[in-house]
Amino acid sequence: MSTIKNVTIIGMGGLGTMFGYQIQNKIGRENVSFLMDEVRYQKNKDAVYKVNGEPYDFRIVTPAEAKPADLIIVATKATGLKEALDTMEPAVGPETIIISAINGVISEEILAERFGSEKVIHAVAQGMDATFFGHELNYKKPGVFCLGIIDPAMQGKLEALDAFFNSIDFVHTIENDIRHRIWSKFMLNVGVNQACMVFETGYGGISEEGSLPRLVMVSAMREAKLVSNAEGITLTEDDLVGYVDLMASLSPESMPSMAQDRVNKKRSEVELFAGTVIRLAKKHGFIVPTNEYLYKRVMEIEAEY
C-alpha cells in the first residue's frame, strides 16, 4: 500500500467539515477536497465558511472534477449515504481506502457492497462536540477516530492509514474489536441523540444527575444494549457507564446531531436509532418502551416542521 497523500471528504456537515479543517491544516488545501453533487455544489461554492469564528477556505469539487483519492472519508448522514455512493464513485480508485464516520451499524456494509470490501476500513468517530449551523463550525473537543478491521487481509491498508494519521497528528486509535466499538457507539447514539432532540437540550442537560433527559437517555441505552447482546455483541454496563461519562466531558452548550436537526428543522436519523432498536426487539421478542416513546415523539416533532 502506497503512502496516503490526498483526501476526499463526502459530507460537509459538522464532522466532515471538522475533519477537513484538521487535515487541510496539515497537508494543504490542494490535497483535501469536499466532493458533492452539482446541486449541493451550486448551493455551497460561494459560501463563506467559518471554523470557531474564523473564515476558512475549503476546496469544493463536483464529480466531473473529482480524481481518484488515496483516502475517502464518508461523513454524510445515514439517510444520505445511498445517494452519496454515485457522487463519490469518480473518486474511488484501485488503491483508495474508504472510512465512514456515519452513525449506525451498517454503513460499511453498504460501502463494501458498492466498492468492494477490500477498500473499506471500519471506523467509529466519537467524543466530538462539533456544532454546525449555516456554514459555521464550532468545536472544542476534536474527539477520536477508532479504526479496525474484520478481515486480516486489510492489515496493510490499516497500517498505511495509521501511518498517515500519525504523520499529521490526527487523533485515532486502533481497535482490536471494532465491531464491539461500532455497537457501543450505536448504544450511545440511541440514548444521547434522541434524548437531546426530544428534550431540546445539549450535553449539559443529559449530564445532570437525576434529570429527566439523563434518565431517558440511560434507559434507551439499556434497551440498545439488550438488543445488541441478542445480536451477539457483548456490550456491558461498564461500556454504558463509560459512554455516559464521556458525554459529561463535552462542552455543555454543544449538542449532538439530532438536536441540531431539530433546530435546523431537518429530518433526523431516528430510524437508524430507535427504529433499529424496535426492529431488533421485535425480532428477539423484547419490549423497548423507552425507544418506542422516543420514536413516537420524534415523529411528532418532525411532523411540525
Label the predicted regions:
Residues 21, 25, 86, 90, ...:
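Short, well-ordered alpha-helices that flank and scaffold nucleotide-derived cofactor binding pockets
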Residues 4-5, 70, 143:
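Nucleotide donor/acceptor-binding cores
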Residues 36-38, 62-64, 102, 124, ...:
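Residues at the C-termini of beta-strands that transition into short coil/loop
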Residues 2-3, 30-31, 218-305:
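NAD(P)-dependent Rossmann-like dehydrogenase/reductase catalytic/cofactor-binding core
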Residues 52-136:
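Rossmann-like NAD(P)(H) cofactor-binding subdomain of soluble oxidoreductases
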Residues 90-91, 114-119, 134-237:
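Internal alpha-helical scaffold of NAD(P)-dependent oxidoreductase catalytic cores
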Residues 40-45, 108-109, 155-157:
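Short, charged/polar "capping" segments at the starts of alpha-helices
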